Amino acid sequence: MSESHLYTYGIIDDNESLALNVDGVAGATRAYTVSYRSLSAVVSDIETTDPERTDAAVEAHNTVLQAVLEHDATRAVVPMSFGMAFKNARTLKGVLRGARRALRSTLTEIAGTVELGVKVLAPGDDTAVDTAAVRSDVTARLSALSVGETENDCFTDRLIINKSYLVEHDTRDAFDAAIDEIDAAHDDLTVRYTGPWPPYNFVDIHIGAEQAQQGGR
């Protein structure tokens, strides 16, 4: 029988043990937590420390993180990038120990917030659109209701805006209402609103990659 390793999805506060029946990476059907002091890693069992990156695997990674958020909408989650698999719990706990200060700081920074995605697209025909005015209007409405925002790639000429916003739970309803107002004010455009997501675009922390690849030597 193959040795089981630990695939890691994200880091949360160690305020409770967590076990979720959810389809994860490499055929996993259950996600659970491995804890070190005030941190818990959300993991599932996996037979390799070098999982193949496929569209289905990335989707499964995101599905587990979504399930964590749905389990407790107020929970702060530091999402890990795809592919973080560790030889065993001892190796993972060692990484958590080494990165504890950075992880605790990040959890504090993102506590009480969620990431929301906003795309605004021009019509597919030749309808003239004042893109500068649209950007100005959308930015004015949404920036005041968020605590952070990032510009994402505009991968098609139709994309006028592609942004991620970090929004506090207390202002989420107001942000939702602002999206409805934008949609009504620009009925010739397509507004795509997604989330909540773990704050991928507002977390810049990389831990344990070398140890994961080396299998915890």
Curated annotation (Swiss-Prot):
Keywords: Cytoplasm, Gas vesicle, Plasmid
Expression triggers: In PHH4 (a deletion of the p-vac locus) transcribed in all growth phases, maximal expression in mid-stationary phase. An unstable 6kb transcript able to cover gvpD-gvpE-gvpF-gvpG-gvpH-gvpI-gvpJ-gvpK-gvpL-gvpM is detected, as well as smaller transcripts. Gas vesicles appear earlier when grown in static culture, possibly due to O(2)-limitation.
Cystine crosslinks: none
Location relative to the cell: Gas vesicle; Cytoplasm
Single GO biological process annotation from the record: gas vesicle organization
InterPro entries xrefs: GvpL/GvpF
Keyword Cytoplasm (UniProt): yes
Cytoplasm is among the record's keywords: yes
One cellular component (GO) term of this entry: gas vesicle
Other comments on record: Encoded in a 14-gene locus called c-vac which produces cylindrical gas vesicles only in the stationary growth phase.
Subunit structure: Binds GvpA.
Family per similarity comment: Belongs to the gas vesicle GvpF/GvpL family.
Function statement: A minor component of the gas vesicle, may be involved in preventing GvpA aggregation during gas vesicle nucleation. Gas vesicles are hollow, gas filled proteinaceous nanostructures found in several microbial planktonic microorganisms. They allow positioning of halobacteria at the optimal depth for growth in the poorly aerated, shallow brine pools of their habitat.
Protein name per Swiss-Prot or TrEMBL: Gas vesicle protein F2
Phylogenetic placement of the source organism: Archaea, Methanobacteriati, Methanobacteriota, Stenosarchaea group, Halobacteria
Annotated gene: gvpF2
